[in-house]
């Protein structure tokens, strides 16, 4: 990520490994899965994607789970899958954008690992996700103006949770 200088990366990850697990959080389109995979590869750490764990458990895509069973059901499964990462020390876990915001997940992640927030502006998020809004459950039926407005609104709603991250990376 922009804040990651090569000179400090090894030292940074040695500190992080003392915390056992790394939970990468942030809004959709901030690069959580991308950077999680990069950091995991560079530091020989296992990588897990929370949405993939959910899809595996429910045998379906996040979008379909959202549509067929609703957000409340999805958030319950998400919380269960998040807690299933507890035994996996020295792992990097990329979380869905809304994961920190329900079921005391943020508090749980802070107690059981290190939370890193990847930050981005609404414009940066839109640039990163504009080609894939149809696959994003919260955005799929919105036009460009509605998507940007929705991103700003949802970012504001999630801010109090994201602000609890132990490390923030712009």
Tell me what each language-model feature is.
Residues 30:
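ATP-binding Walker
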Residues 27:
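P-loop (Walker A) phosphate-binding loop of NTP-binding proteins
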Residues 50-110, 135-137:
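ATP-dependent small-molecule kinase phosphotransfer cores
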Residues 12-17, 42, 156-170:
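NTP-dependent small-molecule kinase module
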Residues 112-157:
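A glycine- and Lys/Arg-enriched "phosphate-lid" helix/loop adjacent to the NTP-binding pocket
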Residues 33:
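Walker A/P-loop
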Residues 24:
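Hydrophobic anchor at the beta1->P-loop junction of P-loop NTPases
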